[in-house]
């Protein structure tokens, strides 16, 4: 049974719609999350955490995988450990000397690397 679920998950992720949804397993359920529902993604050891408005999901994938899979006009890698949904971005705040954070609609502050800050300003036309 578990093998069948794993196969289903793998096949679902390879379908052309993969840029529009993320498939995760929670306990014995399979959940399909529209990528527009993602607020941000955070690296977590050998996993990543996919954060939505009300929850987060663990997935054994890499940041590079999601950076390639997701639409680069909507998702942006702010730091080696974070990818944000630009539609959830409300502002960029200074933190301390040459450090900034991206503030999301849910109030979460996501760190910006120095290069991430420069690239984000370029992307936003600032």
Q: What are the residue ranges of the model-derived segments?
A:
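Conserved binding/recognition cores within well-folded domains
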Residues: 1-111
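Short, basic/aromatic-enriched C-terminal tail that caps enzymatic domains
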Residues: 115-126
């Amino acid at each position: 049974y578990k093998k069948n679920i794993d196969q289903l998950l793998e096949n679902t992720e390879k379908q052309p719609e993969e840029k529009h949804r993320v498939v995760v397993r929670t306990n014995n359920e399979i959940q399909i999350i529209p990528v527009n529902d993602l607020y941000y993604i955070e690296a977590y050891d050998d996993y990543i955490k996919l954060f939505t408005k009300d929850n987060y999901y663990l997935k054994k994938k890499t940041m590079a995988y999601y950076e390639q899979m997701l639409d680069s006009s909507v998702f942006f890698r702010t730091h080696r450990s974070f990818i944000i949904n630009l539609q959830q971005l409300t502002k960029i705040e200074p933190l301390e000397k040459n450090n900034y954070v991206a503030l999301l609609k849910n109030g979460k502050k996501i760190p910006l690397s120095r290069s991430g800050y420069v690239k984000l300003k370029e992307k936003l036309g600032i």
